[in-house]
Amino acid sequence: MKKAFGVVILFVGLLDVARAAAESPPPQFDAKAAERFAKLALACVAKEYPNKISHVLNSDADVAPPRKLTPAFSGCYDWHSSVHGHWLLVRLLRTFPNASFAAQAREALRKSLSAENLKQEAAYLRGEGRASFERPYGLSWLLRLGAELREWDDDQAREMSANLRPLEDMAIERLKAWLPKLSHPVRIGEHDQTAFGLGLMLDYARTTKNDSFARLVSDAARKFFLSDKDCPLNYEPSGEDFLSPCLGEADVMRRVLTQVEFTKWLTDFMPQIPMTGNPPSHGPGAASGDWLKPVVSPDPSDPKLAHLDGLNLSRAWMLEGILSALPQDDRRRAALQAAAEAHRTAGLAAVTGAHYEGGHWLGSFAVYLTTQRGIQKEGTTSQKKNGASEKAGP
């Protein structure tokens, strides 16, 4: 009986935390916040241990420390977190070029993204039995890093981009060979989710004007998701999710459909989004985000249970992405905005660095959200050719 009572108290306590987070004003993103996130990445990109290797051994020669196997991306606990930890530093240097962390971030990037290190990374990927290595999650983040470097008008960035290019090209070839063979999408809330990977791939293809890759990715998204209806959002989340299967799907489809197409598709796909209410800041009668409430990790020190802290962040950016593709007079905007703000507040509050289990990756999710990286405002010809949303901004 005491045990059951304790569980009830814990559950109520978690609800109170989520409710308080949802009612707080959204945190300001400025140079101070950027420094906090940069410190998380700087603390891990060169931190080799602890390390979780996803590694196929072909012989005794493959038994080696991470710094020998993948010298560019041997920190931050695992390969994909190291990749997006480096992306975080590039993104923040572009956003705050004169910040206090700039010199340290540049030096960390210089050491990691050297030509020699990245040649070794490419050799590792070519190893026998590694065709599925970090596919699609890590490879998609690698493309996000590559695109960020290409967009940065900076001499060091151009050098690092050239160093990364062979690995980048290898990732594209891997994904181009894999996507046509993928018979069904992977609809989970973790690394293998197809929708999230497709979104990163498509953003890369459009940034780099790789039209053939953009068409392949857009066609895959349409094949997998265009006929979907009534996504069971009430079944989310699973206990170890850091991505939303339903929102992730909507977030990639707003990239490949026109505004008119997406507005109709979303009605069929997520009919549970409330249709009434004023924006959250408009006083009495304002829309509530209660239709999709933030979650709380029951144990941020557990590497899997800490995923729920990241779920709040990714839900927030996916909700904002959906908003960016809807007409200004769409009656769902207020409810979407309310839910996005609640998740943003709860998600950013959890990015503390108190536990390495979350500290090695949550900063990247926070920066992806706060810099609106997933909402590309450049209406390029490549985007229009491949069915980009007609409306670029939120």
Q: What does each model-identified segment do?
A:
Residues 23-74:
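Low-complexity, Ser/Thr/Pro/Gly-enriched N-terminal "stalk/linker" regions
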